[in-house]
Amino acid sequence: MSAKYEAYIESEADGLDISVLAVVPDETPYRGILQLVHGMSEYKERYLPFMEYMAKRGYVCVIHDHRGHGKSVRAMDDLGYMYGGGADAILKDIEVVNREMHQQLTAWVPWQSGLLQGIMMTAWIC
């Protein structure tokens, strides 16, 4: 089994609430942490089955909705609109989520995995 946690983290770029989802195994010690970065026009819940699969194998999985995606919007009409800051703001949001992971799970070094658009963004950060 695993537990799901949802929260919002404030973007350092412009104060936008970034929606974050974590799936945490019930048993410890954890085998590791996986930070997922979704692609363009996607949303975090799409990866929930994979996150649950990995949690059953001992991995903490964390993903967030990019600005303008899923629940990281100020209004539903803003889906697809990334607000100010462009790519720099998206990269900053990924870093903020990563930093929060480090603070919450200090004994682990997270792995980042990008999917489609996320591949380019994680390569830029790593």
Predicted feature descriptions by range:
Residues 82-105:
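Alpha/beta-hydrolase active-site loop
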Residues 121, 125-126:
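Hydrolases whose catalytic domains are alpha/beta-hydrolase-1, hotdog thioesterase
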Residues 105-120:
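Alpha/beta-hydrolase fold nucleophile elbow
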Residues 42-46, 89:
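Glycine-rich anion/phosphate-binding loops
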Residues 46-77:
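Conserved alpha/beta-hydrolase
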Residues 34-42, 120:
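Active-site glycine-rich loops that stabilize anionic/oxyanionic intermediates
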Residues 1-27:
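N-terminal cap/lid segment of alpha/beta-hydrolase-fold proteins
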Residues 31-33, 115:
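Structural motif
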